């Protein structure tokens, strides 16, 4: 008989909001009372830091900006972060995993976020960035700054999630207020952090611990996540399908993902066949050449509901490992066999193909992260 496992979680997770956009996103998370993480706000703007609800703040570049901000100049933002590398290092030390939230295109977020990531990686910390890209109406110059910032940031993070603000406009409609639109963007950032944090902080029958998260999230490249909640007899299949069809995953060829992290959250009525159903649904898109980590966690408040969270990482990277299925407990062999036998055609790679990758003429269908969409709850608001 399965018994709930008491979770001993020593992993330290820190969330760093860089610049105005990142600071707003972290402040939003603080107000939503996300558990199991420490929050920091980093900015060149002293006034913004005085007003924030984030408990721990770091002012950077006071000798350069005199506390007045970076003036929409990423070079100033970078120099400001360089000036206070020691303060950033002190804040990051002791963390096992760091989320960096920033809005790309401005001065501080664009210039300083890559420096924060660089410091984190120098400390050996698993580093994930969740950033927004500017609206098209903000101009080509700001968009160019954003693209440059994302390129630089990608050099220093393990996984990178980008959310184009224009997707908010398309999904929520032109009648949405500016405050509500940016609030929705903050919800996207919050969902990414909360979804991964809960994977390793909630106890369950099959825990996804920090080592599992590191295995998947360290597959360097672009990352996407989706989640689904359903109830009733077919709740497992419905929740899994919602997770993998979430707009965050839409328009992306997930067969190129090098890592897939799956967490099933339900009450004490979770059945073994429901675990298998989720596994069978995930296998329909998982590549042959991926690390798949599956876990379950228990939430007595879920009642009849079941939630599936899927994180796909390493998208767009060339080197891919042989498939590995990682769980904390043994899965029935038929399920294991099906994971190893099924997979979508891999992307064409400019390298020697690994075993099982024999389709050298397959068209490259993966799209750039610009095409990331908005989570299902936002799409439903527009319906």
From Swiss-Prot:
Annotated positions binding GTP: 20-24, 107-109, 138, 142, 186
Subunit text: Homodimer. Polymerizes to form a dynamic ring structure in a strictly GTP-dependent manner. Polymers persist as long as GTP is present and disappear rapidly as soon as it is consumed. Interacts directly with several other division proteins, including FtsA and ZipA. Interacts with polymerization inhibitors SulA, CbtA and CptA. Interacts with MreB and polymerization bundling-enhancing factor CbeA. Interacts with CbtA, YkfI and YpjF.
Gene Ontology molecular function, alphabetical: GTP binding; GTPase activity; identical protein binding
Free-text note regarding domains: The central and C-terminal regions are required for dimerization.
PTMs per UniProt: (Microbial infection) ADP-ribosylated on Arg-174 and sometimes Arg-338 by Tre1 when infected by S.proteamaculans strain 568. This prevents the formation of Z rings, inhibiting cell division, leading to cell elongation and disadvantaging E.coli over S.proteamaculans during competition for nutrients. In vitro it can be de-ADP-ribosylated by S.proteamaculans Tri1.
Keywords in alphabetical order: ADP-ribosylation, Cell cycle, Cell division, Cytoplasm, GTP-binding, Nucleotide-binding, Septation
HAMAP family: FtsZ (MF_00909)
Classification via InterPro entries: Cell_div_FtsZ, Cell_div_FtsZ_CS, FtsZ/CetZ, FtsZ_C, Tub_FtsZ_C, Tubulin/FtsZ-like_C, Tubulin/FtsZ_2-layer-sand-dom, Tubulin/FtsZ_GTPase_sf
Localization per record: Cytoplasm
Outcome of substituting residue 105 to S: In FtsZ-84; loss of GTPase-activity and conversion to an ATPase
Induction field: Repressed 1.3-fold by hydroxyurea (at protein level).
GO biological process, alphabetically ordered: cell division; division septum assembly; FtsZ-dependent cytokinesis; protein polymerization
Protein name, per record: Cell division protein FtsZ
PTM-bearing positions, type (Microbial infection) ADP-ribosylarginine: 174, 338
UniProt cross-references to CDD domains, sorted A to Z: FtsZ_type1
Main localization category: cytoplasm
Transmembrane segments: none
Activity regulation, free text: Formation of the FtsZ ring is inhibited by SulA, MinCD, DicB and toxins CbtA and CptA. Inhibition by toxin CbtA, SulA or DicB overexpression is neutralized by cytoskeleton bundling-enhancing protein CbeA, while inhibition by toxin CptA is neutralized by antitoxin CptB. Either FtsA or ZipA is required for Z ring formation and stabilization.
NCBIfam families for this protein: ftsZ
Known role: Essential cell division protein that forms a contractile ring structure (Z ring) at the future cell division site. The regulation of the ring assembly controls the timing and the location of cell division. One of the functions of the FtsZ ring is to recruit other cell division proteins to the septum to produce a new cell wall between the dividing cells. Binds GTP and shows GTPase activity. Polymerization and bundle formation is enhanced by CbeA.
GO (cellular component) term, any one: divisome complex
């Amino acid at each position: 008989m399965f018994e709930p496992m008491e979770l001993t979680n020593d992993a330290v997770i820190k969330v760093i909001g860089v610049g105005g956009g990142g600071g707003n996103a972290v402040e939003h998370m603080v107000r939503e009372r996300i558990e199991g993480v420490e929050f920091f706000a980093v900015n060149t703007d002293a006034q913004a830091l005085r007003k924030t609800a984030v408990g721990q703040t770091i002012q950077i570049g006071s000798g350069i900006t005199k506390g007045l901000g970076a003036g929409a100049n990423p070079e100033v933002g970078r120099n400001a972060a360089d000036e206070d590398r020691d303060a950033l290092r002190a804040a990051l030390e002791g963390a096992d995993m760091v989320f960096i939230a920033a809005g790309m295109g401005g001065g501080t977020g664009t210039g300083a976020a890559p420096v924060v990531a660089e410091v984190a990686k120098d400390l050996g910390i698993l580093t994930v960035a969740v950033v927004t890209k500017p609206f098209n109406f903000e101009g080509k110059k700001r968009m160019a700054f954003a693209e440059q910032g994302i390129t630089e940031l990608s050099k220093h993070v393990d996984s990178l999630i980008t959310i184009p603000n224009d997707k908010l406009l398309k999904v929520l409609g032109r009648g949405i207020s500016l405050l509500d639109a940016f609030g929705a963007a903050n919800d996207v950032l919050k969902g990414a952090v909360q979804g991964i944090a809960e994977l390793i902080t909630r106890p369950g029958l099959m825990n996804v611990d920090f080592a599992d998260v590191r295995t998947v999230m360290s597959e360097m490249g672009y990352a996407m996540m989706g989640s689904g909640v359903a109830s009733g007899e077919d709740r497992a299949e419905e929740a899994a399908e919602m997770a993998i069809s979430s707009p965050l995953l839409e328009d992306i060829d997930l067969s190129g993902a090098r890592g897939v992290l799956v967490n099933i959250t339900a009450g004490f009525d979770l059945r073994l066949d429901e675990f298998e159903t989720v596994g069978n649904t995930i296998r329909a898109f998982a590549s042959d050449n991926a690390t798949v980590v599956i876990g379950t966690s228990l939430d007595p408040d879920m009642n009849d509901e079941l939630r599936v969270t899927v994180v796909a990482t390493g998208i767009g990277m060339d080197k891919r490992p042989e498939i590995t299925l990682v769980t904390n407990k043994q899965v029935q062999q038929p399920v294991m066999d099906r994971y190893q036998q099924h997979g979508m055609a891999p992307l064409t790679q400019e390298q020697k193909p690994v075993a099982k990758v024999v389709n050298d003429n397959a068209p490259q269908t993966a799209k750039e992260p610009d095409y990331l969409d908005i989570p299902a709850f936002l799409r439903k608001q527009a319906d």
